[in-house]
Amino acid sequence: MLSIDHVDWLELIRVTLHPLAKFPGPKLAGASYCYEFWYEVICGIQYTQKIIKLHEQYGPIVRINPDELHFNDVDFVDVVYTAGARKRDKSSHYLAGFGGVSKSTFGTLDHMHHRTRRRALNKFFSKSRVLQIEDSIHEKSQQLCDKFLAYRDQGPFDLTGAFSCIATDTVTEYCFGSSPGFLNQDGWEPNCKSYFETIERMAHVTRHVPWILYLAKWLPLSIIRLVSSDLNSFLVDTRVKKPERLKRVVLDAERHDAKDCPVFLELLNSDLPPREKSKQRFMYEANGATLAGSGSTAIAMSNIVYNLVANPRIGHKLRSELLGKVSDPKNLPRWSSLEELPYLTAVIHEGLRSMYDPSKERLPYDPSQERLPRIATEEELIYKDGSTPGKSKYVIPRGYAIGTSAHVVHSDESIFPNASQFNPERWLGRDGQRNRELERHLLSFSKGSRYCLGMHCRCTTCLALPASVRNGTRGY
């Protein structure tokens, strides 16, 4: 009885005296995490869709759980997702679903700690550094096209799984100096698509029931295999394969010159503090890089190719533009030339914008399109709402999470009219060139000091693949 009374008092305080109690939103969402749990776990990852409806009901800023706000105002994006000296921590509730990912750069809670880890990685994923592996990306793109041709008469296959093969091979080879060789195998299985999706879906459960992660950590693989083959594959990769690759990187160090040195070998030789170079931390860093570098890239490319086939007019227009630039699929132009093609760039942007499928029927689940909360630790944020009479200003107290979702912004009809339609022309100005103003609202890579580290690598792959698929297979 005492514990029940305690819960009742806690919920009452949350909706009356809590610093976020003044913000609009369902009282149940403010009182308890059960509201979020219902839509995330029981309803099957549907909270983002529910949040869209909450904004329609309550306005551009909504309290979505006891300690977190969600906003839907593009003018406020650069305030929350800021760069420079303004500190932004991540939310411990958000990161709880990822377990040991806190040891990776992506999962680092504290702003300054993140800066230390991020600084060590930035140079490896800069545009100039990614250009050094552009030839490798082009070779793998052509290899993928050759494989498409070889398997074209052998029935349907999972397109996202196929793109997962090239994405995983690319990022793993760059980080470790060797890859799983998914493109070299017969067929498209195995690949990382299935177990990555399982892990990402599990995060919504373990965020509320974290002890599941600790149980999975200590259970033997023989038992895990009986529960979930995908989870078993992920743990085998984490516990066995990645440690073997890292060990091989160290043992074969003398075979790599400075230019071709794998990322993790350079990190081992960097000026990071010794505690940041532990094998366990590098395993989590590797998991983060592989998950981010392959899953989202595969989904984006699958979405783009699907829409090019489903919309012959768009495919024909892109094909016409590529004919003037790409004469030989085995000798693709450089990134700098491909990104000058306005319609190709527009197709890529539209593919990134529309890569979230709420039904999960056409495209796999992609967590990068959902909310990414931030916490301002040293300042109060001022939000001015001109759409709600009498409530034109909110003061968001320091220490509480606030964020938005890429999918929510990308579905905003005031920014992207007919948002449910795949329409690359929206990214072009009247002169047929890139609409730079609209590109400011693309949040597929997040923004600010914690924007996606692999952005340039993904962009290079996304630019190369449509050109290769079009010329190498005479596709779309």
Curated annotation (Swiss-Prot):
Which pathway or pathways does this protein act in? Secondary metabolite biosynthesis
- Do you know which InterPro entries this protein is assigned to? Cyt_P450, Cyt_P450_CS, Cyt_P450_E_grp-IV, Cyt_P450_sf, Cytochrome_P450_monoxygenase
Keywords attached to this Swiss-Prot or TrEMBL record, sorted alphabetically, are: Heme, Iron, Metal-binding, Monooxygenase, Oxidoreductase
What's one GO MF term for it? Answer: oxidoreductase activity, acting on paired donors, with incorporation or reduction of molecular oxygen
Q: Does the entry annotate any disulfide bonds, and if so which pairs?
A: none
Q: Which cofactor does it need?
A: heme
* Top-level EC class as recorded in UniProt: oxidoreductase
Query: Cross-referenced Pfam families, in alphabetical order?
Result: p450
Positions with a binding annotation for heme: C452
Q: Which SUPFAM superfamilies match?
A: Cytochrome P450
Q: What is its EC number?
A: 1.-.-.-
Which domain of life, per UniProt?
Answer: Eukaryota
Protein family per UniProt: Belongs to the cytochrome P450 family.
What does this chain do? Cytochrome P450 monooxygenase; part of the gene cluster that mediates the biosynthesis of pyrrolopyrazines, secondary metabolites showing insecticidal activity. The role of ppzE within the pathway has still to be determined. The single multifunctional NRPS ppzA is sufficient to produce peramine via condensation of 1-pyrroline-5-carboxylate and arginine, N-methylation of the alpha-amino group of arginine and reduction of the thioester and the cyclization to form an iminium ion resulting in release from the peptide synthetase.
Q: What is the official name of this protein in its record?
A: Cytochrome P450 monooxygenase ppzE
Designated gene of the protein: ppzE
